[in-house]
Every structure is written in C-alpha cells, then in structure tokens.
UniProtKB/Swiss-Prot annotation:
It is found in: Membrane. The gene is cyp19a2. Belongs to the cytochrome P450 family. CDD domains: CYP19A1 (cd20616). It comes from Carassius auratus (Goldfish). It comes from the Eukaryota. Heme binds at C457. InterPro entries: Cyt_P450, Cyt_P450_CS, Cyt_P450_E_grp-I, Cyt_P450_sf, Cytochrome_P450_Monoox. PROSITE patterns: CYTOCHROME_P450. One of its GO terms (molecular function) is heme binding. Its cofactor is heme. This is Ovarian aromatase. One of its GO terms (biological process) is female gonad development.
Amino acid sequence: MAGELLQPCGMKQVHLGEAVLELLMQGAHNSSYGAQDNVCGAMATLLLLLLCLLLAIRHHWTEKDHVPGPCFLLGLGPLLSYCRFIWSGIGTASNYYNSKYGDIVRVWINGEETLILSRSSAVYHVLRKSLYTSRFGSKLGLQCIGMHEQGIIFNSNVALWKKVRSFYAKALTGPGLQRTLEICITSTNTHLDNLSHLMDARGQVDILNLLRCIVVDISNRLFLGVPLNEHDLLQKIHKYFDTWQTVLIKPDVYFRLAWWLHRKHKRDAQELQDAIAALIEQKRVQLTRAEKFDQLDFTAELIFAQSHGELSTENVRQCVLEMIIAAPDTLSISLFFMLLLLKQNPDVELKILQEMNAVLAGRSLQHSHLSGFHILESFINESLRFHPVVDFTMRRALDDDVIEGYKVKRGTNIILNVGRMHRSEFFPKPNEFSLDNFQKNVPSRFFQPFGSGPRSCVGKHMAMVMMKSILVTLLSRFSVCPVKGCTVDSIPQTNDLSQQPVEEPSSLSVQLILRNAL
C-alpha cells in the first residue's frame, strides 16, 4: 500500500548512509570557501589601514607640521640647542642652524620653541605683520638693564611701545632730520680738528673710538643738548652693552644662583642709567631757566610728557638711554667696517671720490647734494648687506599663524636671520663685496637692513643721512689707511647681539693722511 501511495509522486528510495555522507561532503566544501573569504577580508582590511596610514603621513608632511631642526630626544635636543646659543652667541648659533638645516629651522631657547628664518619670503611675512610686534628675551635679564616694558628696543608691552615710539618718530623725522646734516658736518670736523688726544705714539688713531665720539656727540646735540664727557659716557655705554648681550637670553636660575654675577651686571647697567638720569636732570634745569622754547628736542618732549603723567620717570630715563646708545654701537661700527671695505676695494674708493668732486664741485655739503651720491649710497647698501653689524632681529608671535606652510603657535619665538638672507641668490654676486649687487633697484623683500613694517627701525632715514654726511666729510679731508693686512675678514669679531670687532689696538688703529698731502 505504501508503494502505491509513493509511486505517483515519482520519488526514489535512498539509503540513509548515502544521504548523510553527501550532506557532510557538501558542508566541508562550503567551509573551505568560507575560510578563504575570511582571509581575503582580513588582508583587504590591513591594506586599507596601511593606505590610510600612508595618506595620514603624507598629509602630515604636506601640512609641514614638522619643521626641520634638531631632534627633541627626550629633552636633550632643546638643552643642546640652548647651550649653543648661550656659548657661541645668538648670531653665530643662528647661522649654524640655518647652514645645517635650511632657511627655516626649529630650535629651542630656554625651553621655548624658536624658529630661525632666513628665507626672504618668510622674513618679509613676519616683518610686515603686526602679529609679530613683540620681542622675546629673559624677563629678569631685561629687568636688569631696564628694558622690560620700557623704552623702545625690547619693550614688548605693545600699547606702551606704540606710545613711546611716537616720540622717537617725531625726533627722527621732520625738523630733527633737517638739522642732522649740519650737526653731523660740524661734529665730524670738530673731532677731526682735535685728533691729537686720540693718537698713539706712532701717530695712529683708534678709528672706532673716533667714530664713537663723533656719533655720541651728534646724538647729544640732536636729542639731549647738555654738556657731557664723551669718553666717560662711552665707557659706561660699552659696559651696558656687554651686560645687555650677556643677560638677554639667560635662564632664571642664572640670576638666582650666580647672584654675584647678577650683582655685577646690575651695577654695570646702573652706572649708565644713573649717568643718563643726571643728564636728564641737567636738561630739566635748563628748561626751567629758559625764557622761551624755540624748538623742543627729544628729551624735552619726554620731560613734558612725564610732567603731564603720560610717562614714568624710569621710562623717560630708558627712552633717553636707548636713543643715546643706539648709534655708538651700531652706526659707528658700520662706518668702521665701511672704511675697511673701502681700503680693500680701492677702485670703489676712487669712484666715490670722483662722485664727491662732481656733486660738490667745491661747494659745502648741502641737503640737496645727498640725492646725487648714487655710488656712495650703493656702497653703503652693499656694506650693510655684505657685513652688517646687526644681522638678525628677534620677535614673538602674538597669535597662531602659518609661515610658508608651517604652523606657528602663539608665543613662538622668531629669529629673523637677515644677514644670511642678504646672501641669497637674488644678488648677482651674493658672497662677494660688489657694487654690482645694487646696480639695479633691489625689492625690499630681499634687502632689509633696517627692517620694515610696524616695528621697523624708526631712525632709518636719519641713519642714512648721518652715514653719508660723516663719510663725505671724513673722506674729503683724509685718506684712512688701516694696518697692513687688516681687513673685515681678518680682524677678530664676535657675533652675539651684533657683529663687533674684538677691540685690539692692532686692528683698530689707522693712519689718517691728509688728502692734500697725497
């Protein structure tokens, strides 16, 4: 009966053992395919993760988060880079790192991230932005020399810096600038007429000391206007400057542990501060006794601002101090290097003398003549490019920024290595002293001897007038003959806060020979 019932359905009879075996075989076959699928899926996932990692690394380097420079190495890198700055000086260390790592480098000074820039576009970016109007330096060091939130040079209180800068701008432009030429000529001639007290037994003159005396006298006549002892004041300025570059980036522990050195530095700085305070008091008495004020100079303007409560006594003193010291240790040394370069390049000296004769034509030097000294101006610019006294400037970022694709965080220190930037391939002969480098107009982004932007040197126009007038007056009367073999490259120099000659008589003494005696 069962057979009858099943027959219409067309079903076959199958043994149970065969059915089970077939099922197991099919399961085993499906399992092998599943294992292969799992392996392929895992490999695909790993490849995808690797691709994502490579893309992340590429993005990281494309965004330039990693600035070239020494490695961190658990804090050893920051320590070693800071020691190099302390040991060799800021200028020398900056040149070392730019030479080793390129034109944008990250180092550390006192544990703070610091960028050293010598690429012209990066330097120009920083100079022109108000984001970088602050400077960096040791707070205790700046307090030691009276520059912390006072004066103009290292004052990082931007609001107060802007206020005092207006006094400098007024003194260094307008009527003050118009008086500069006459005062420079008078002062230079006066000192050249009285060379005997600067001559040694061989009849040679300490030319750097002569230039410093001329420049400090000019500064006094322009900005202070009281009797002073030039040599005594210059000695105090020299000690103040040494203290300045010694304490500028020292760590706080230096001032606490090396208290005897701190006391010495404070005493050296205080000597000049007291001398300036005494000169300001002389000026105050002079103003009190004056029946009328024909023209107020820089110090008089500051004294009146103090009397109206606009400035503190300490800030007035620091402003006058910085105005008086600025030229003797920058402009006078620049002139010293220029005189050496002239003797190294007699063809350039001859061209300048011929230009002087053509422009002056036997007449006294006047303002109208200055624009005619094209060769002289090219010589001054090339000297400032080839061997600058101040070859870097220090800034601090007031907010986050991006420089050449690199992220810069707020508070990052910036060193603009302008001296190295001036050796760029833009100039026809970047590593040579040649007037060909200024045969054509040079865009400001490639040549920044006085900086640019909101914190540029406020006295750059007056500095050019002073250099031209002093050089023309000196060269029209004397030929400057250094000791044989004395060149810009051969004399010992330091490069910390600025490039300065080591003051040895053998390298600073020159023979001044009258032109009409040649």
